[in-house]
């Protein structure tokens, strides 16, 4: 769940190609995207077949469609050409890397990370290779972290940096993974190295992200407010990337109205940004502005919401509950069907929408707490900390969330949602009981 520095690839005047955040990190550090819909492949993904992209509730005997994920209409001719080139020469590393990068990026941009399975399929012949070029290690590292092998992903990205230290995107993702793993000292070093290698303007952005993740949100707001106005960062990807983090800094600094206004403005200019749409819908729900949250989450949705990501569907469901809207039951049924479909496909990783459904929506608090405990062992992100604390309190097991309290104390992180929950955990009668 890297919910994320996924960026669309682009070139900048002073910094090499970078990927926009979009849900990291779930992915690298997109803290709000309900990321990493990784699949238990079980031999299903091969060079000739991949998980079907369209949502479906399969029969137990047919949980996977063998057709290319790109046979569905609407895909660009460029993507189709990359797909065909890879399938024509599945042992050609260059073709495989080009295809893997394209579908990995698509998964993030669409908020549907089942495309990660397609990326892994392309890289399967080199999954154990030790002599890859820098791009090979980098792409394999991204896919590994997408499947929650964060240590393996970090090893590959470290190797990519060793082979080609002049690639800014390599450093960006390593910074993101260090944040995900709560290794703040390493993230600080990455930030300093980025400033040294790619200039102080670039370094300032990373130091600002680190600032709001370590209790210095107002300083982050000031830095990011400067960065978003710089001439070198006026391209679409940079505006979304910096704007997302500036909004997060506002939110963490107890300035939700500023965050909402910023994300609304950016979303009007970049309506295809899943990251901005999800972040805005989530914050509007947090603020009790359910009508607006639902409108943002369901913009351009089909009648049955089949084109909504799980994360956006979950926000629509929370908004409908807040509104006491008559479609709440139907939305809940759609969410349950998707989770059932994932179970039939044997998807083994924990998505944030599932945690929200179980905990914030209250469908299964016991299961939600168990999943939170498991998830926290892998990755440590603010939205997951909130859900973990909520589940522990609801189940009268405050001490179960002690790792969240320790993480907050160590990193200095706090936000308007988490702070009162930590106070409640420490004051709860079960907190003073013997540790489990």
Describe every region a protein language model picked out:
Residues 98, 139, 173, 206-207, ...:
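Canonical tetratricopeptide repeat
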Residues 106, 110-113, 147, 181, ...:
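Structural motif corresponding to the intra-repeat A-B loop/turn of tetratricopeptide repeats
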Residues 50-135, 427-431:
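N-terminal leader/linker segments that initiate helical-solenoid repeat arrays
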Residues 95, 136, 170, 203-204, ...:
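TPR alpha-solenoid repeat register
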Residues 90, 131, 165, 198-199, ...:
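Short coil turns that delineate tetratricopeptide repeat
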